[in-house]
A protein has these predicted regions:
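Extracellular structured ligand-interaction cores
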Residues: 1-3, 42, 81-84, 93, ...
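Ligand-binding loop in jelly-roll beta-barrel domains
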Residues: 72, 95, 102-109, 115-140
């Protein structure tokens, strides 16, 4: 994963400010995804295929990051919050679980999550990658 950030320096010139791996990368327990914090509200997650265990995760990394994400059951990663999430499948395919409903999403598909807590499971047998863009909404 490579992140390139552009900006303007003190003289007003456009510059490349950074080029490399995102500074915040962490892995969630068990079959949890690897999370790449691209920017404040943009995350890209790599989901291992269901059934593969990632037993050597760093417990301390979980304590450093906000609890916007949890692991439900053994393999389904679920997300909570008062926001609209734009979920863009970049690589592979995922199963989106909401209550009794399951739907397959593939590379190129976009899911809009509105104040819901669905679970995501990778049943494809290969690595899958999903970008999440989080937009907070006000509670009424």
């Amino acid at each position: 994963m490579r992140r390139i950030v552009t900006g303007v320096d003190a003289t007003g010139q456009a510059r490349i400010q950074s080029d490399g791996v995102p500074t915040q990368v962490y892995t969630l327990p068990g079959n949890g995804p690897t999370v790449y914090e691209i920017w404040n509200r943009i995350r890209i997650l790599d989901f291992l295929p269901e059934g593969r265990d990632r037993s050597s995760y760093d417990q301390s990394s979980l304590r450093k990051h906000p609890s916007w994400m949890g692991v439900a059951g053994d393999t389904a990663a679920s997300f909570a919050g008062h926001c609209v999430d734009y979920c863009i499948v970049l690589l592979g395919e995922m199963t989106l679980i909401r209550g009794e409903t399951e739907i397959m999403v593939r590379a190129g598909d976009v899911v809009m999550q509105r104040d819901t807590k669905p679970a995501w499971v990778n049943r494809s047998g290969r690595l899958s990658r999903v970008a999440f863009i989080l937009v907070e909404t006000a509670l009424e």
